[in-house]
Curated annotation (Swiss-Prot):
This is ATP synthase subunit beta. Its main location: membrane. Produces ATP from ADP in the presence of a proton gradient across the membrane. The catalytic sites are hosted primarily by the beta subunits. It comes from Streptococcus sanguinis (strain SK36). One of its GO terms (cellular component) is proton-transporting ATP synthase complex.
Length: 468
């Protein structure tokens, strides 16, 4: 291993000088520097630029407090490597793959893999478009997820993003035996802590690996932590042959950290002050998230939209990679409809007859048409009342309200709070239920029978209890 000395420290940027004739470290190599405390604490640096004259510019993955000029820096000869495999399940890691959950020590002999890899080649990719059944009616019917696809999750505070994420993790684990990897990128430490304890309480932590690089950490850690989570997910896909769910919260913070690093490295800023390499960095991350012939990594990415401006380069670059969007709407929360997924604003590339089948596509299209018409009639109803509607419109409104309530369902992970057992509804049951509502088979049942239930049989059972 070649070694150099710190030449200068500018915040999270550290320049390291190597002696003439020494082998310079490659770009993305991890360097290690020990502070002046008898080598008890070390800092990992990642090589970003070669400046010439034996000097490399690096980005620190931890705070550079305590570093001084002249300290020795060792080249590890490889990129940052993180633990992979079944031992990672139920544990919480940082960007470097160190455990931060204060649990039992992690096995020192666990397999590790570098976070920088090439995307799968064309001949390794799976060409089939297969739906990932979630058991959540509104998603499976109107905005289905593709195996190996990328989903954008939009929603403000308190609309149920975390509960939806937990239910997806639960359903993938219970029904598909699948693994989930949760990656917290540049978000609040408190939220990560709350999520960890909630997942412990709901019992889904055993099928989940968690990786955090929160907003108090240097930009280098926030930029690379998404790759750490992805590397753990890729191992389960490529070696274990699993279908993996990868949650990234929040993909905007990945771009934001890249922008900070770019400015620190002295690159000329691009549009709105973002890094000129924005599309490349996003592409390198997103292209690794895909289906191969061995398994799949399906990612659900929470996306913060700055000032609700969807033309901002950060969200706009992420949108180019998405297959589906799931929009959570506060108005639905106020109506007591959970999950509060907006059926008209959410969309999916998978909702086509070639992928989901003719019947599913026709039912989904008709559900959207009925809900859209109901949305248009709401102003008339609010001003003039239901009496001003024609008989056909009254029937449509009644069915639309039943559809709206039937799109809600109780979640397994929320059972401890609601006291109501959760339900997993297969896609075929979902399509059949909505088809029967559209055909008018359940027009005589009360609206309340459709709220917070699973299949159409649950509606009939609830109506019977209500005396219908």
């Amino acid at each position: 291993m070649s070694s150099g000395k710190i030449a200068q420290v500018i915040g999270p940027v550290v320049d390291v000088a190597f002696a003439a004739g020494d082998k310079l470290p490659e770009i993305n190599n991890a360097l290690v520097v020990y502070k002046n405390d008898e080598k008890k604490s070390k800092i990992v640096l990642e090589v970003a630029l070669e400046l010439g004259d034996g000097v490399v510019r690096t980005i620190a993955m931890e705070s550079t407090d305590g570093l001084t000029r002249g300290l020795e820096v060792l080249d590890t000869g490889r990129p940052i490597s993180v633990p992979v495999g079944k031992e990672t399940l139920g544990r919480v890691f940082n960007v470097l793959g160190d455990t931060i959950d204060l649990d039992a020590p992690f096995p020192a002999d666990a397999e590790r893999q570098p976070i920088h890899k090439k995307a799968p080649t064309f001949d390794e990719l799976s060409t089939s478009s297969e739906i990932l059944e979630t058991g959540i009616k509104v998603i499976d019917l109107l905005a289905p997820y593709l195996k190996g696809g990328k989903v954008g999750l939009f929603g403000g505070a308190g609309v149920g993003k975390t509960v939806l994420i937990q239910e997806l993790i639960h359903n993938i684990a219970q029904e598909h035996g699948g693994i989930s990897v949760f990656t917290g990128v540049g978000e609040r430490t408190r939220e990560g802590n709350d999520l960890y304890w909630e997942m412990k309480e709901s019992g889904v932590i055993e099928k989940t690996a968690m990786v955090f690089g929160q907003m108090n950490e240097p930009p280098g850690a926030r930029m690379r932590v998404a790759l750490t989570g992805l590397t753990i997910a890729e191992y389960f896909r490529d070696v274990e042959g699993q279908d993996v769910l990868l949650f990234i919260d929040n993909i905007f913070r990945f771009t934001q950290a890249g922008s900070e690093v770019s400015a620190l490295l002295g690159r000329m800023p691009s549009a709105v002050g973002y890094q000129p390499t924005l599309a490349t960095e996003m592409g390198q991350l997103q292209e690794r998230i895909t289906s191969t012939k061995k398994g799949s990594v399906t990612s659900i990415q929470a996306i913060y939209v700055p000032a609700d401006d969807y033309t901002d380069p950060a969200p706009a670059t992420a949108f180019a990679h998405l297959d589906s969007t799931t929009n959570l709407e506060r108005k639905l929360v106020q109506l007591g409809i959970y999950p509060a997924v907006d059926p008209l604003a959410s969309s999916s590339r998978a909702l086509s007859p070639e992928i989901v089948g003719e019947e599913h596509y026709a039912v989904a299209a008709e559900v959207k048409r009925v809900l859209q018409r109901y949305h248009e009639l709401q102003d008339i109803i609010a001003i003039l009342g239901m009496d001003e509607l024609s008989d056909d419109e009254k029937t449509l409104v009644a069915r639309a309200r039943r559809i709206q309530f039937f799109l809600s369902q109780n979640f397994n992970v929320a059972e401890q709070f609601t006291g109501q057992p959760g339900s997993y509804v297969p896609v075929a049951e979902t399509v059949r239920g909505f088809k029967e509502i559209l055909e008018g088979k359940h027009d005589k049942l009360p609206e309340d029978a459709f709220r917070g239930v699973g299949s159409i049989e649950d509606v009939l059972a609830k109506a019977e209890k209500m005396g219908f």
